[in-house]
Amino acid sequence: MTLQAPSPDGLWTPPAIIPPEADPHVLVLAARSPGNQIRGWSRKVFYEDVWRPAPTTPVLVTQPEALRRIFLDEAEDFPQGALFRRMFRPAWGQGVLTAEGAAWRWQRHASATAFRPATVSELTPLIVAATERAVTEWIAKSAKAPVDLEPAITRLTFDIIVDTMLSGGEYFDRDQMKARISAFFRDIGRIRLSYMFLPDAYHGHRPDAHSKLREPLLADIRRMVTARRSLPARGDLVDLLLAAKDPETGQTMDDALIADNIMGFILAGHETTSVGLTWASYVLAAHPTTAQRIREEVRAVVPQGPITADHAPQLVHTRQVVSEVLRLYPPGFLLTRVAAKTCELAGLKVRAGTRINIPVYALHRHRKRWRDPDAFDPSRFAPEAPPPDRYAYLPFGAGPRICMGAAFAMLESVVILATLARRADLTFAGRKPPEPVAVFALRPKGGMPMRVTVAPDPKSYAT
């Protein structure tokens, strides 16, 4: 199932999961799904516009025209559904990431200010400082043994969220909170067969599967919110939520709702970014040409001193690499919606209540949408290249519910990758290429062990 097939264009092909050509029985697919969801897909998903393994199972849709309807034109007819709420409300409570309708609209408006491009660019020095500290630590540790960059990068992106959005998070213990978050994600990543194969309505009144791990995290966050109410404003995400007011009703957020939103942003804001960067680190190690080209770009744009907000837009090739990594390894490999009423999608009649799965991993490698889809080719995203169909490339979703932190995530990823390539040389220390495992996010099986050494010609990157 893990392939490194030769590219017809002679390009490097990194590890991938492509289901077998023969369609297994639906029960075989069911048995494969809990350990790696993509193993439960048919290869048809990579070739066709729509696929359904059995009459009562969810429909998998990859046709861009249908996806535009789902995410944009008819978005209100395709809500997130009961299964989504059951899986993610333990993490995000009643916050913007799981809210619907009017509750979603005003929370989204209140939160979006923190992620405006002008606001995000001001955070660059904090991102750079955290990354410089982390890379220095990785180089030192690697002198004794390989460093697993999967948890290391996750810790880096967690620290960045705390530094940039929570003004340093002095009201909780970072190590303790990160350990609790890791335990939470391990638990939420246990995929149940009912998630894949039972109708959405089945989940409407089922108990939350992960609530017991939520309370300790919320207690830390609520303590911070309570303390911040009596302190001068700092202009961070916490203050924006404290001041938020529904323009229609005048409603403000109580401590519980603020805590739900902060917890959601912490969880969504660092885990997904870290997964993409973990795969990007493998690209630097396995494809030295890419690492060298990024180094040369950084050398040209930033001859001395730290990377700044003004430099980031000039790191064009680095951004192309990030975009291509997110195509090949989208952290959110699967999006879900539910048909609120009977409709037709890509020629298939879909009854009301049917769950619609959007297999982003397959969409990004679809044989109809991409040339040489399994190959690594950052030139797809070059300024002079024709842009991909808006609904064939969904690293951050689409439509009204597109990830509001997309600009922050891209800036963070570009700055971290540029700093890492500038400062360090990576050598993959695993016995075999990492296998993508799709459970909660698209992670590498067995982590990402790396030897991290000082980059060639370090004087060129003096800070």
Regions found by a protein language model. Name each.
Residues 1-6, 11, 131-135, 151, ...:
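Cytochrome P450 proximal C-terminal region
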Residues 272-297, 407-422:
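Cytochrome P450 catalytic-core helices
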Residues 358-385:
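Conserved cytochrome P450 K-helix/beta-meander segment immediately N-terminal to the heme-binding cysteine loop
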Residues 23-46, 219, 223, 305-346:
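Conserved cytochrome P450 K-helix E-x-x-R motif and the immediately C-terminal K′/meander segment
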Residues 2-106, 121, 128-133, 171-172, ...:
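N-terminal membrane-proximal hinge/A-helix region immediately C-terminal to the signal-anchor transmembrane segment
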Residues 232-238, 295-315, 328-348, 357, ...:
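Cytochrome P450 fold signature focused on the C-terminal beta-domain
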Residues 2-14, 79-85, 103-105, 119-275, ...:
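Cytochrome P450 heme-thiolate monooxygenase catalytic core
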